[in-house]
Amino acid sequence: ITNSEYRQFVNWVRDSIIRTQLADMAEQTGQTSGSGGIGDFAYLDTNTEKMNAYQQYLQNTYGDQKARKLNKKKALIWDTNKYPDEYYSEVMDKMYLPEEEAYNGKRIMDVQKFEFKYQWLDMEKAARARGKRKDFIKEEIVKVYPDTTVWIRDFNYSYNEPMHNDYFWHEAYGDYPVVGVSWIQAKAFCEWRTLNKNAYQKSKGDYTVN
């Protein structure tokens, strides 16, 4: 897997977390789409009249979270000078490291918050034991950002600080293999790829993959 491919995963996780927090804040503050502020990032199902029958069923049966849809058509705003309101600013501020951890006056995102959650079915245990299917469904929460410190930690006698700083993000290394990804992170990446593939298959009316 290349840096570019894994970077897509990291960015997707980052953006999904931000969009979810923006939608939650919009709901908490009563902001709705069209307000020009954080309301433009509200959950799409805020207007129940626009929900299809299946979404209405999910909401009525399982609660809001099963039917919630993020507004991914609205581009995220990264320029602090263009933040639409204080609520948006509050959400974005929480995604960055605190001021006291800023380096050379520049704050960076707290990559420890980039977490991907997924579920999987433990088929081996399910085959050996009796029980309900839900008893064998496992949930994983994985921090997805690669450990870039391996460049310094694993090469004691080399000057690898530039690689630590640039290797994962610089476009010049986009087609190079990703470094610092654990087995757990690799499995999470594969789950995400399957998720994307199934979304594409579903949009075409094709069978999904396991």
Kindly give the residue locations of the regions a language model identified.
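Extended beta-strand/loop cores of jelly-roll/beta-sandwich
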Residues: 1-210
